[in-house]
Amino acid sequence: MGNASHFALFDLEPDFRLDQDRLAVRYRELVRRVHPDRFAGAPEREQRLALEEAARLNEAYQTLKSPSQRARYLLSLQGEELSQETTVQDPAFLMQQMELREELQELQDSADLAGVARFKRRLVQDQEQLNEGFAACWADPRRRDEAERLARRMQFLDKLFAEVRQLEERLDD
């Protein structure tokens, strides 16, 4: 499998829109082939190579499974590494981040589980809009700035989703 792209590992074309079921099925097929148990009696070198390939498949799968990671990966394939400093230069985005974090803090302070559920539904809608926007522009070099901006926003939503999950766990206890 060598240095093939994450997409090539799974026989997929590089695209933001992926058939997640096909990706999962292909992942399971490939991982079964290199599972360490299959190489238990093999020479040490083969065991190590199988373990390395399993780790590579897992990393590729995790990257392609996540919309924000997939977006960053697609941009990196085109030579675009996202800089964190650019996020700070987007005042509207910074304001939105602050407002969402304040709202989440208020939900935590009030222990409002129903409010957290509504907040999470809004985030899911926001994520779907970002995904559609990125899918429409990532491959167009003229819209690269927009694709990078959307990918950064996806990252922010990922972090916010993680905070929401933590809050849900605390409120459920």
Curated annotation (Swiss-Prot):
PROSITE patterns: DNAJ_2
GO (cellular component) term, any one: iron-sulfur cluster transfer complex
UniProt domain J: residue ranges: 5-77
CDD domains documented for this protein: DnaJ
Pfam family membership, one: DnaJ
Superkingdom in the source lineage: Bacteria
GO molecular function, one term: protein-folding chaperone binding
Keyword terms of this UniProt record: Chaperone
Gene Ontology biological-process annotations: [2Fe-2S] cluster assembly; protein complex oligomerization; protein folding
Signal sequence coordinates: none
Biological role stated in the UniProt entry: Co-chaperone involved in the maturation of iron-sulfur cluster-containing proteins. Seems to help targeting proteins to be folded toward HscA.
Subunit description: Interacts with HscA and stimulates its ATPase activity.
Family that this chain belongs to: Belongs to the HscB family.
Protein known as: Co-chaperone protein HscB homolog
The species this protein was found in: Azotobacter vinelandii (strain DJ / ATCC BAA-1303)
Name of the encoding gene: hscB
